[in-house]
Amino acid sequence: KSTDGGKTWRHLGLHDTRHISRIVINPKERKTIYVGALGHAYGPNRQRGVCMSQDGGQSWKKVLYTDERHGVADMDINPENPNIVFAALWRFERKPWTFISGDEQGGLYRSIDGGLNWLKVTAGLPKLVGRMAVKVSHSNPSVVYVMTEAKDGTLYRSDDSGVTFRRVSKEVEIVSRGFYYTDLRVDPQDENRVYAVSSRLWLSIDGGKTFKRISKQTHVDYHALWIDPRDTSRIWQGQDGGIAVSYDRARTWDYINNFTVAQFYQIYADNREPFYYVGGGLQDNGTWSGPSRNREPFGIMNDDWRMISFGDGFHIVVNPDDPELFLSESQGGNVVRTNMRTREQQVVSPQPRRADGDPVSELKYRFNWNTPIVSSPHDSQT
């Protein structure tokens, strides 16, 4: 918790929740806080579910918990009647070669007494659900949306404050790779203007019945969207390519490129002189290389950095005899050899085709999402 605008922070407990999906604050009683905890991603644990504090985070009480395998994927609260609180429970476990996402024990839970007691909402919602997003309309809190991974549909709407729901969309694209994205936003001033946050960004202006893709000029894989409640034409988005802002209600977008938000998986350094080069693999932004310094009066510029290969950049190996020859690796054990002088590339993966999306049983070799590659310190050809 920060009380000085983010300059300093104080730990408030719940250390074993490991992954927290959402923090919700009662708009009429600011000391009442709800924490939606997903819990451990790789195994069961008991510190998951909904925890509530009534003293600004000094102490916590677990108010919604079903078992050690179901955690909270999302939460929201009715802005006019904050006694109505929603929590979406989800079973998710990562395994060495697969994962578990969803079951019939998960689903949407609703409280009408400020989180003290909860009931599972079943009217109109599918039984078998994966990750869920739940959002209450601020312009009309009787309207509640739920987006989920499910065979029966993807978007559901309630017009009675979440007592019952009806399916409004079966569009699967709005929950593309649902276990990884699945988020939802409702325009604070228009209950029928709905944004689906997924691998692509989607907009509905008819209450979720139809969607169209927007923001085609920005990077894909969206993880965050914020709509200014005072001026809904101003919208901020966060995706694997960085941060962008719209000032015209999502018609056009401007990238905010004056600060660094890149995430390196792995870095390297070579032995060239007089200045060695550094580089590495970036999350969903390829593999890059650039000088550690130069003799130019303005120092290192963006143009000094060169992209070696595409995809989710992970490990990189430089030839010790020729610093312009690289082996770079992207998701699923895909390895590319690149000559930066000629810009020639050749796929040299042990597996001749991409592993993305293929059943594990059909693959000759199996590779982690992030598969290390190393070169021999004794033989430059190995």
Predicted regions and their residues:
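Beta-propeller blade termini and top-face loops
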Residues: 1-382
